Each structure stands twice: as C-alpha cells, then as structure tokens.
Amino acid sequence: MVNIVEKQNRLSLISLSLVSIRYKSWDFLYRILHGSIFDYIIGPRKELLLYFKCVYDSTFFNGKNYFSNLFTDTATSFRLLTFLNEHDLKSIPPLPLDKCQGLDSYSTLYDGYIVQSSHESQGLYDGSGKDGNDYTMKMQIMKNVLEMQINEMDDEIKRIKLRRNVVAKKLDVIISRIVDHKENKSKTDGSTEDEVHIGNTSSVLKQTNHEHTIITSENNTDDKVSLLTLEPDNAQIGNKLQRYFEAMKLKKKSSGFDIEDFENIIGTKGQLGKTLKCHDDYINSLAINAQLGVLSSTANLDNEIKLWDISTTQCLGVLSGHRATVNTTRFIDDTRLLASAGKDASVKVWDVDNIVDKDGNANDNLCLATFDGHKDSVTALATTGNAIVSGSNDKTLRHWDLGSGKCIQSIDLTIALKMVPQSVSKLDITPSFNTPLIGGADCIDNALVTGTKDGIVYLWDLRIGRVVGSLEGHRGPITSLKYMGSELITGSMDKSTRIWDLRMGSVAELLSFEKEVVSVEESQTQLINALEGEPVKIYDRGERQYNSLPDSFNTTTLVVYESLLALGNDHGDITWWSL
C-alpha cells in the first residue's frame, strides 16, 4: 500500500512539476520545492525533487532572468554583461540550461579569444572543448561580435565625414566673411580701384579660431607672414625702399633703345649672332631692361645674378646675396629695379642703375630689400606698378607692396582653390623635385594670372585675393606664361602652346610639337617656342607657318624685346638673334 502511495505521490509531483514548467508557474513550483513540505519528503521522492529543484533554479535564474530586478529589464542586463546589442542577442542560438548562467555568459576580449567562466565546460577557441555545439556557439557569437564592430566602425566613418563637411562649410563662411570685411574696410578707408589697402583682420581671425588664413593682415606679426627684411637695417625698411622706388622711376633716354645700335652682336635677320659664355650650368632665367640696355642671367647651382651690357656684351657686375640657386628674375615696370627669387625661399630687390659707381668701380651694395616670408623655393614672379607677386612651392602667393615694404596679402592655395566651383578638386598641389607648383605668373594692374603643375590657369583679382576664373586644357605642367591683356599665351610639358582668348574663355589657337615646351615669348605676330632637345620653333600667326632657328638646340629659356632675341642653353651660353 505504501509503495502504491509513494508511486502516486511521485507521479503527482512529476505531473505538477511538468505542468508548472510548461506554463511557467514558477511561483507555485517554488512554494513546493522550497516550502516546508520539501523537508518531509525522503527517499527517491527527495532525489526527484532535488532534480526538479535544479532544473527550476537553472531555468529561473539562467541568462536573461538571472539579472532581472526592479531597476532594469532582462535584455538590458544581458546586453551589458555580454557586450552585445539587441540584434546580436536575438541571433544567439539556443543553449542547454546548464550553460549561460549569470556571469558564466561569454564576453569578448581584445586578443580575439572567447573565455567561458564556467569550470564545467571550459574549453579552447580551437574547438577542443567537451561539447561540439559549444564550439559552434562560440564561433557564432564571435562572428556576430566582429560584424557588430565592423558596423560600428562604418557608422563612425560616416559620422566623421559628416562632421568634416560641416566644418568645411563653416570654413567657407569664415573665408567669405574675411573677404567681405576687407572689402568693406577698403571702402571705408576710401581706397580707389587701382589701390590695394588691406585692413587689420587679425581680430576676425582670432574670433574664428582658425589656423589657416587666405589673406593675412599687414599688421600680423606671427610667422605666417614674415615682413620684409631690409639689408642692412630693418628699422629703415619703409623709408629706404620708398625713396629708391620713387627715384627709380624711369625717364626714357633721349637716344632710346634702337635695335640698329646692336647690329654688331645681332647680325642679319634670322642668323645667329654673338655667343657669350656666361655660366657653368644650364641657364634658367633671362630678363631684359631695354631702356637701360641691360640683360640679367641666372643659372642652376649658381647663387648669383650676372648683368650684361647688351651693346658691348661685357659683364657689368654680379649681384650676390641669395643663399641658393636663383630661379627667376624680373625687371620691375618703369623702374631700374630688378626682382629676383630663388630656392632659398627669398625675394630680393636690386638697384641695377648703380651697378657701377661714379669712379667706374663695381658696386657691391645693391640689394635694397629682402622679402623673407615664404617657407619653400620661390618659382614665379610677377610685377605690376609698385608691387611684386611671388609664387612658391610652400603653396602660397604673396603680394608685396614696394611703397611700404610689406606683405599686404598672403593667399593659401589649399584654401583658395577649394572655392573654385568646378572640377579643380582633382588638383594636386604637391610640388615635385623637378616640377614647380607654380610654373608661371604674370600681372597687369590688379589682374594676376598663374599656371600650375596640373596644367590649370587661374585668374585672380588681387583686390580681394580670390580666383575669379580658370582655364583648363593643358594635360601637363605649365612651364611658361605670357599675359597680354585680352590674350594669354601658355606653354606646357604636354608638348603644346595655347593662345587663350580671355574674353571668350576659350583657346584661340593650339600649337602642337613633338617635344615639351620649356619657354614661350611673343614678338609682334610671332610666337617663339623653346622645346626640350629641339631647335627653337617660331610660329608666324599671320601666315600660320613654322620656322626653326638653326643651331638653337638645347635652349632652356629665352627672352625677347622687339626683334632682339636672347637664348639661354643647357651649357650656360647666351646667343643673340635678330627676328
């Protein structure tokens, strides 16, 4: 009888427990297993109830339910303890009840391993644990976690790009405000169309807290714009240069510049004249002041500028002061002043008129001023009125006023060119060893033209320091540029010379060659093209014909005045021609 009762009690408890588990009547089952009746049960019934008590505890307190309380939900607790998001929680495969309990759940480590806290099922990541399903589960969790991390990285990249776009828009607004401020300041100060007066913008720049400036103030004393350094006394900078500038205004000689006076060196038309041995390396710059009858020349690896008397072909003197190769020279309009720029990142102004003193001796103290503002090699110069514009590999253009001896504008190309509304975003403004960033520059009044290594021509308004137009067509670096009012001539390493109609913004004529164009000049209706390793080609625009100058191979630069042509070659020689 007792055995029958025990069996009935056992079956009743089993049925009751199963029903409770099936319908999740945890409170009712808890009272049975943890109540006083449990203490009176002995024998096999006790063992059975212990089993169900274990099942109950593992079910009620496993995983998500273990950390449930009045302050949080199970999903949040489980996510925090396992470092998984809601999506990954839903994708976790089912586990045995003796797995995934409380702090025994899995978590990722930075070294790529998965560690389980339970001592009963501790295994290695290589699948050598006791349970094959355990290993599969580990791999699945690891896969989900890594995918989650990748998604988070992608989201972070999107947020960074979005923030960058916002900052770029703010930058454009700040630049526009700076330009508007300068325009309003100029109008308030009563500046005319032909003058450039840049007010103090340092307060505006400080308010914006921005590191880059497109136009810097002439009163700015930090390293971004280094003011002109005069030799030998900086304190006399403005007065000395102003005095020389006013005194150097040229009045034409009564005799003028007559080509016939130089027939002895030029020879007959189209024939080679006299050849001068001037330098030891290839000549990189020539400049003529016809009213003085002086030619200047510079060469590679030569820190000096040599001045030549055109009528006698004698060397008048040497200008020393640069600390590295002189890249380019230019006579300042209507003055006896010569501007030079070199790889030492400096721009110098020289008094050429006093190359010889009253006693006929060479004068060594001819450098009037040194502009030390650039941080890299200066490769292009343009002069207009009483100003000089210099272009450098440091990605800036600087506008120097000879009247005051100060830098009145500093234009950062990395910022200014981003404001051009066209396909210039592809522009690579990184200078290379052999190709300068700015290959040519020319200026008329406040209109500046520059040519870059990517073959793009930019038109600038110096009054506001901004690009007002661009010309695209060249497929190689621009090496030479000549601005002639309504027309512009450019030579390029893409083996072409282009004549641009600036009124239409298009190419008027295109000249193609078999070699790279290294220098271009214009004389009346003729275009003189110096080509890499070939004779000089002369194009007659009226007759549309090409002619070659004999014995003009390896020309590296050239300069022309009326029918006088001077060629510099890679041997350091200068040859004269009559066109």
From Swiss-Prot:
It is a peripheral membrane protein. Gene3D superfamilies: YVTN repeat-like/Quinoprotein amine dehydrogenase (2.130.10.10). WD repeats lie at residues 278-320, 321-360, 373-412, 419-472, 473-510, 512-539, 540-578. Belongs to the WD repeat MDV1/CAF4 family. Its main location: mitochondrion. This is CCR4-associated factor 4 homolog. Residues 137-167 form a coiled coil. Involved in mitochondrial fission. Has a partially redundant function to MDV1 in acting as an adapter protein required to form mitochondrial fission complexes. Formation of these complexes is required to promote constriction and fission of the mitochondrial compartment at a late step in mitochondrial division. InterPro entries: G-protein_beta_WD-40_rep, WD40/YVTN_repeat-like_dom_sf, WD40_repeat_CS, WD40_repeat_dom_sf, WD40_rpt. The keyword Mitochondrion applies. One of its GO terms (cellular component) is nucleus. SUPFAM superfamilies: WD40 repeat-like. It comes from the Eukaryota. Keywords: Coiled coil, Membrane, Mitochondrion, Mitochondrion outer membrane, Repeat, WD repeat. CDD domains: WD40. PROSITE patterns: WD_REPEATS_1, WD_REPEATS_2, WD_REPEATS_REGION. Pfam families: WD40. It is found in: Mitochondrion outer membrane.
